[in-house]
Design a protein with these regions (language model features):
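Conserved beta-strand hairpin/beta-sheet module of binuclear metal-dependent hydrolase folds
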Residues: 99-160, 285-289, 293-299
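Metallo-beta-lactamase
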Residues: 109, 134, 141-143, 195, 201-277, 321-326, ...
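Bacterial N-terminal signal peptides that target proteins for export
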Residues: 1-8
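Bacterial N-terminal signal peptides
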Residues: 9-16
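Active-site metal-binding motif and surrounding structural segment of the metallo-beta-lactamase
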Residues: 132-133, 143-195, 258
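N-terminal pre-domain segments of enzymes
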Residues: 22-102, 326
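Sec/Tat signal peptide C-region and signal peptidase I cleavage site
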Residues: 17-21
Length: 334
């Protein structure tokens, strides 16, 4: 099998000439609004923190993930200021979300079966143990962050052949780190099946290449990338802390999941694919693993509000259709 590789110019790490606004003390209005948030939400409930740290195995020693030249691709300790209590200048709910999202490393989700890399990029990277290797779900945004996570798995769990890579959907933070897996797996890239939803490649090119310049510029504002990372600047993006600024690539799927969904057995692991197009992404798949009683929700369900309209200009999501997909998942796999 010959793998066709195409690299995208994703405008993730372009420099911008922005003048930082002077940091000022929060107004009385801001302070009162933030105080009201504290009163309206159950901040004494620490279950989120227990969930976010459960199964922690290890993380890297370095303060950041860098490329081959030593340039920072993704900062880790830069978010350490979030350890303190929320200041009057910050929305305490977003601050708490940042505290959760800054937790990073390798986690065991299901003993001996499912492992996850978190906090190395905006998305997570998941490893499913098959009979003779690994099935990888989503590969982060950059080669560097994905490789840091992959090496952590090899070091603390096991270095096994990669049997398949599954893209859940064509948002760049879920597929662009693919080269880290293909170039560093112990088996040949040609032996790795790449699975994605129907229409994945077309949707990835449409959003990230055709509209890449404009969307990249808007994303800079949306994520507050040029703001300093401190209590009066960037404290996170809600869904994750920030996006990586490294090497990106795109390898088309070798197999697409039909819109009707289907069931596959990959190296002994049964996977029931549920196609959910037109909701969180133009094309997307969720997965149920009957043998493990595990369900991968892709980005249809998060511990955030459902993102119906992104400020970067992605397609508007169909909220009604989205809700029906969640109902279907509960009915069929709950």
């Amino acid at each position: 099998m010959k793998i066709r590789k195409q690299f995208l110019l994703l405008f993730i790490s372009t420099s911008h000439l922005f003048v930082y606004a002077q940091n000022t003390e929060p107004s009385v209005f801001t302070k009162e609004a933030n105080e009201q948030v504290v009163k309206s939400l159950p901040f004494d409930n620490k279950q989120d923190f227990e969930d976010a740290t459960r199964g922690f195995i290890a993380t890297i020693d370095e303060s950041s993930i860098t490329d081959e030249t030593g340039k920072e691709v993704y900062g880790l300790t830069v978010w350490d200021f979030l350890r303190q209590e929320a200041p009057a200048s910050a929305n305490p709910s977003l601050w708490r979300q940042g505290q959760l999202n800054r937790i990073h490393g390798l986690f065991e989700v299901l003993p001996g079966k499912i492992y996850q890399i978190r906090g190395f990029d905006l998305a997570n990277m998941t490893f499913i143990r098959s009979d003779n290797g690994w099935i990888v779900i989503d590969v982060l945004l950059s080669k560097e962050t994905a490789l840091a996570g992959y090496n952590l798995l090899k070091k603390h769990v096991e270095d096994l052949p990669v049997k398949a890579v599954i893209y859940t959907h064509p948002h760049v933070d879920h597929f662009a780190g693919i080269d880290a897996i293909l170039e560093n797996a112990p088996n040949k890239p040609e032996a790795i099946e790449i699975i994605g939803p129907k229409g994945f490649f077309e949707d990835a090119v449409s959003e990230n290449l055709m509209a890449g310049v404009a969307m990249g510029r808007r994303a800079t504002y949306m994520y507050g990338r040029s703001l300093p990372k401190n209590e009066k600047g960037n404290i996170g993006t809600g869904l994750g802390q920030t996006t990586a600024a490294g090497t990106t690539g795109l390898v088309p799927p070798t197999r697409e999941i039909s819109e009707e969904g289907e069931t596959l057995r990959i190296d002994g692991v049964e996977i029931v694919f549920m196609s959910v197009p037109g909701a969180e992404a133009p094309s997307e798949i969720m997965m149920y693993f009957p043998g493990m009683k595990a369900f991968c929700v892709a980005e249809e369900i998060n511990r955030t509000l459902h993102n119906l309209l992104t400020l970067r200009g992605a397609k508007v999501r169909n909220g009604q259709l989205w809700s029906k997909y969640i109902d279907r998942a509960i009915t069929e796999c709950g």
